[in-house]
């Protein structure tokens, strides 16, 4: 019973940590990453389709992304979807592909991204605390139903807190690591 609660807490906490790392990929660092375009969708035969499912998206160098659609008529659609996404660059259509040239980041942009990373970390910590609350509620219910003793419940609460501390530390480390990556010129 208790192991199920702990395993569920671990699984959910791991998902929160993975979600944080996925969120971090949307932040621009000194070196350009194609994940910055992951949230962009284009109209493809009436359906909103992720950009990477209708085109090849490559980082040609540290500051340029090249998007080559699999069907030429999509060039204009891709260009307007990127312009509408407001990612800080203007798309450049050369007739074959859409190129995005990212200027070097300013100190202010880097600091703004650090703020966003910290906010993402805080959101992940809130998620971890909610997971802890759910686990504690499950232990409390077992204790109330007399399925476990008061001593077992106390040990279970301690274990839930230990897991919470472990994942909170992992989140702090991830945020610190991302912060140093963002500030590196």
Curated annotation (Swiss-Prot):
SUPFAM superfamilies the record matches: Ribosome recycling factor, RRF
Coiled coil regions in record: none
Entry keywords, A to Z: Cytoplasm, Protein biosynthesis
InterPro entries, per the entry: Ribosome_recyc_fac (IPR002661), Ribosome_recyc_fac_dom (IPR023584), RRF_sf (IPR036191)
Major localisation: cytoplasm
Cell compartments where the protein resides: Cytoplasm
Pfam families listed in its UniProt record: RRF (PF01765)
GO molecular function, one term: ribosomal large subunit binding
Gene Ontology CC terms, in alphabetical order: cytosol
Function of the molecule: Responsible for the release of ribosomes from messenger RNA at the termination of protein biosynthesis. May increase the efficiency of translation by recycling ribosomes from one round of translation to another.
Matching HAMAP family: RRF
Family to which the UniProt record says this protein belongs: Belongs to the RRF family.
Protein name according to UniProt: Ribosome-recycling factor
Gene it is expressed from: frr
């Amino acid at each position: 019973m208790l192991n199920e609660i702990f395993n569920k807490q671990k699984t959910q906490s791991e998902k929160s940590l993975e979600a944080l790392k996925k969120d971090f990929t949307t932040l621009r660092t000194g070196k350009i990453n194609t994940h910055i375009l992951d949230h962009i969708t284009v109209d493809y035969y009436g359906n909103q389709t992720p950009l990477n499912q209708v085109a090849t998206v490559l980082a040609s160098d540290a500051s340029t992304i090249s998007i080559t659609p699999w069907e030429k008529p999509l060039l204009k659609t891709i260009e307007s979807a990127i312009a509408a996404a407001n990612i800080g660059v203007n798309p450049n259509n050369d007739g074959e592909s859409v190129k995005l040239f990212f200027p070097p980041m300013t100190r202010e942009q880097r600091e703004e991204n650090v703020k966003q990373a910290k906010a993402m970390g805080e959101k992940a910590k809130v998620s971890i605390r909610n997971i802890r609350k759910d686990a504690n509620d499950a232990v409390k219910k077992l204790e109330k139903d007399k399925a476990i003793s008061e001593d077992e419940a106390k040990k279970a609460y301690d274990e839930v807190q230990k897991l919470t501390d472990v994942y909170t530390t992992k989140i702090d480390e991830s945020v610190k690591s991302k912060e140093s990556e963002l500030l590196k010129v």
